[in-house]
């Protein structure tokens, strides 16, 4: 399953904001950018402010990872499922935007290794209060 709409980052302005202001955390096959939420960039039909000021995520997988959309979508779905479970543990007072970008080397890795790398990036960024 994919992330709910209230947890997704959408729009090129939001991605530009993340690329310009986000803190960068690297691993061998993944990149994490973390920035404080900017509610002015969200166009939401949901009038409830708890959705506007919540933690949001995006996963970016370029054509360099795989030319086949099926493969990219499988990776994206796997990472979305994992993130959905992890986001339940984020404190509600943290309004963060997370952008995970996969590198071409990620295609050769085992899915368990990718999830482990995602965990290490999240712990480097100190997102959770575990």
Swiss-Prot record:
Its EC number is 3.1.26.5. GO terms for cellular component: ribonuclease P complex. One of its GO terms (molecular function) is ribonuclease P activity. GO terms for biological process: tRNA 5'-leader removal. It is an enzyme of class 3 (hydrolase). SUPFAM superfamilies: Ribosomal protein S5 domain 2-like. InterPro entries: Ribosomal_Su5_D2-typ_SF (IPR020568), Ribsml_uS5_D2-typ_fold_subgr (IPR014721), RNase_P (IPR000100). It catalyses: Endonucleolytic cleavage of RNA, removing 5'-extranucleotides from tRNA precursor. Gene3D superfamilies: 3.30.230.10. Keywords: Endonuclease, Hydrolase, Nuclease, RNA-binding, tRNA processing. It comes from the Bacteria. Consists of a catalytic RNA component (M1 or rnpB) and a protein subunit. Belongs to the RnpA family. RNaseP catalyzes the removal of the 5'-leader sequence from pre-tRNA to produce the mature 5'-terminus. It can also cleave other RNA substrates such as 4.5S RNA. The protein component plays an auxiliary but essential role in vivo by binding to the 5'-leader sequence and broadening the substrate specificity of the ribozyme. This is Ribonuclease P protein component. It comes from Prochlorococcus marinus (strain MIT 9211).
